[in-house]
């Protein structure tokens, strides 16, 4: 989300490649069980891309104004919702580890999604606080430059 707001589009491919390399190492040498490796693994690309797109769409609102930060936070939560639905939904449907019923999926979402949303909210708020501090510092420097 934050990277989508700050970095060029080509860096998404770089980050996805890095994630695949880290996962390959973890599955091959790190002792991580391959239960997450299924057709659903490929769905991480659109899942993460939904977060990236949310960041790209929100970047125009990052003007330093409170309303813009609220829009940024809204995009962060919307991107998180799409990412969660794509990643968890595809893993649930295609991993072969679960009985694919709506009630089972929803019970798992109610168990695990709050942690996903709270993590995204934490990082979005941390970014907003950092942006507020940065904007305040830039304004102070500009005013200081005008007074000399």
Model features per residue range: what roles?
Residues 12-17, 41-46, 69-77, 117:
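Hydrophobic alpha-helical transmembrane segments
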Residues 8, 31, 95-96:
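Short helix-capping/hinge motifs at transmembrane helix termini and TM-loop junctions
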Residues 1, 43-51, 123, 127:
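Hydrophobic core segments of transmembrane alpha-helices in multi-pass, intramembrane catalytic enzymes
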Residues 1-15:
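Generic transmembrane alpha-helix motif of multi-pass integral membrane proteins
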Residues 4-7, 51-59, 127-135:
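Hydrophobic transmembrane alpha-helices
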Residues 61-148:
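Membrane-embedded alpha-helical hairpins and interfacial helices in multi-pass inner-membrane proteins
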Residues 17-57:
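Interfacial aromatic-anchored transmembrane helix boundaries in multi-pass membrane proteins
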Residues 6, 20-21, 82:
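Hydrophobic membrane-targeting signal helices
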């Amino acid at each position: 989300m934050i990277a989508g707001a700050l970095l060029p589009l080509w860096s998404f491919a770089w980050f996805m490649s890095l994630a695949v390399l880290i996962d390959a190492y973890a599955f091959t040498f790190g002792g991580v069980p391959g239960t997450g490796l299924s057709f659903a693994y490929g769905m991480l690309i659109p899942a993460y891309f939904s977060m990236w797109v949310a960041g790209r769409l929100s970047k125009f609102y990052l003007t330093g104004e409170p309303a813009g930060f609220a829009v940024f936070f809204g995009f962060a939560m919307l991107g998180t919702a799409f990412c969660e639905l794509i990643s968890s939904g595809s893993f649930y449907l295609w991993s072969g580890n679960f009985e694919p019923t709506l009630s089972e999926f929803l019970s798992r979402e109610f168990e695990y999604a709050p942690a996903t949303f709270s993590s995204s909210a934490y990082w979005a708020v941390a970014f907003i606080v950092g942006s507020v501090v940065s904007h305040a510092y830039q304004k102070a420097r500009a005013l200081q430059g005008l007074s000399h």
